């Protein structure tokens, strides 16, 4: 399969310019245990970097408790989602791809079944699908990256089994039928249906930004995502890491990914760094964003595509990270982060209050090739001035053959109050 995948993606990219690939396949014999990824995943990671393409992979499906006792699909949901046997299927653990899990569009009951007390739904709208496989990814990184609608299951005691969209369309996702001479449309349930929906969103981003790199597409999509409140509430009994392992960064908001609005501004850049170097980007902060007690959020998303090697324990050959600094002059920031010779002495210390406490912290986010974190203010921040600085660092690993690492960064400023943030920031940038 890896060689076939390489041949197919390379040919489609070279001959037809295809830049988005959706792979709704998985090896049921290769459940990712958090250790090394397989050769299939490594091949996709290599192709994403070599060809500058967006590869989207379904997380994989599993019947609740593998179908041993079907009624447990209802009574023990959502606990079984975190079982060891419900981890991602190869190649969904790949690092440079977008891995997609599934959420339900509703309870799956149609008009005929809604009044039958014997039929029991498992989910409500926007809760994790009972078949969706989960992370975390390599080294504890965030996987799946995103979720989208992929259907649900219902328990039908009349036939003593769980039923999905294949035979109860209300439980599934409407799609075209491959046997179109018999019937044009059909339905189904699975992450194989949620992955193409993310592919559509990626296509919309490329239509708006035709020259965007794969890194920028990933960064914009993941920056826009939010975990549905219904999913968070359903998973909270399973602990703090359950939401990240099941839903990743959440469900894409396509308008948010592609556009700014009056109270929300998205800035982005594409760049590359030599190994063991860093870059500092100024983020203008309008006065209206600094003042008052309204809730304001800065969200940062970094995406890069490191070289990988399947045979190594340290799979990625390059690492990247970021910090958000406020209240400091650029010269001080450069002095703080640059490498220093021994004769120069220690670097100048930076007070904690100047280093924005982004969540999740670096130990969690730096395990992934798409890193997202944010900070929310509920009081005035005038004392830190009208410029924040984003420090992006590139750290060498085993990939000594690599000179520079490409990446994309997205920074979003969001203010809940009714203010014309976009207009104020545009004036600052033009000035």
Swiss-Prot record:
SUPFAM superfamilies: Subtilisin-like. The keyword Flavoprotein does not apply. Pfam families: Peptidase_S8. GO terms for biological process: proteolysis. GO terms for molecular function: serine-type endopeptidase activity. Residues 1-258 form the Peptidase S8 domain. The keyword Aminoacyl-tRNA synthetase does not apply. Keywords: Plasmid. Belongs to the peptidase S8 family. This is Uncharacterized protein y4bN.
């Amino acid at each position: 399969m890896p060689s076939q995948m390489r041949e197919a993606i390379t040919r489609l990219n070279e001959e037809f310019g295809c830049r988005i690939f959706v792979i709704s396949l998985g090896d049921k014999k290769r459940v990712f245990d958090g250790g090394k990824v397989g050769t299939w995943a490594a091949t996709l990671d290599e192709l994403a970097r070599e060809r500058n393409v967006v590869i989207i992979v379904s997380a994989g499906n599993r019947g609740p408790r593998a179908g041993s006792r079907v009624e447990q699909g209802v009574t023990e949901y959502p606990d079984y989602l975190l079982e060891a046997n419900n981890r991602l299927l190869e190649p969904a653990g790949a690092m440079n791809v977008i891995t997609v899990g599934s959420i339900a569009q509703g309870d799956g009951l149609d008009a005929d079944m809604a009044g039958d007390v014997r039929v029991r739904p498992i989910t409500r709208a926007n809760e994790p699908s009972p078949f969706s496989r989960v992370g975390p990814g390599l080294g504890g990184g965030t996987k799946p990256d995103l979720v989208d609608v992929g259907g649900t299951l219902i328990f039908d005691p009349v036939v003593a089994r769980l039923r999905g969209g294949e035979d109860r369309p209300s439980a599934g996702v409407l799609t075209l039928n491959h046997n179109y001479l018999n019937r044009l449309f059909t339905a189904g349930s699975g992450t194989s249906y949620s992955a193409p929906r993310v592919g559509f969103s990626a296509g919309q981003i490329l239509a708006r930004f035709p020259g965007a790199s794969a890194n920028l597409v990933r960064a914009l999509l993941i920056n826009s995502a939010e975990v549905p409140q219904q999913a968070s509430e359903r998973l909270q009994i399973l602990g703090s890491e359950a939401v990240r392992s099941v839903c990743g960064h959440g469900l894409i908001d396509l308008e948010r990914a592609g556009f700014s609005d009056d109270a929300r501004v998205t800035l982005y850049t594409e760049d590359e760094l030599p190994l063991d170097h860093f870059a500092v980007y100024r983020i203008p902060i309008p006065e209206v964003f600094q003042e008052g007690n309204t809730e304001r959020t800065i969200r940062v998303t970094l995406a890069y595509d490191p070289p990988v090697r399947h045979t190594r324990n340290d799979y990625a050959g390059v690492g990247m990270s970021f910090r958000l600094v406020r209240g400091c002059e650029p010269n001080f920031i450069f002095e703080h982060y640059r490498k220093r010779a021994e004769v120069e002495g220690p670097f100048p210390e930076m007070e904690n209050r100047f280093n924005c406490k982004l969540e999740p912290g670096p130990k969690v986010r730096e395990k992934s090739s798409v890193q997202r974190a944010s900070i929310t203010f509920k009081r005035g921040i005038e004392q830190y001035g009208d410029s924040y600085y984003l420090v992006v660092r590139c750290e060498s690993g085993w990939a000594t053959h690599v000179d520079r690492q490409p990446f994309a960064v997205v920074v979003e400023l969001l203010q809940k109050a009714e203010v014309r943030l976009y207009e104020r920031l545009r004036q600052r940038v033009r000035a």
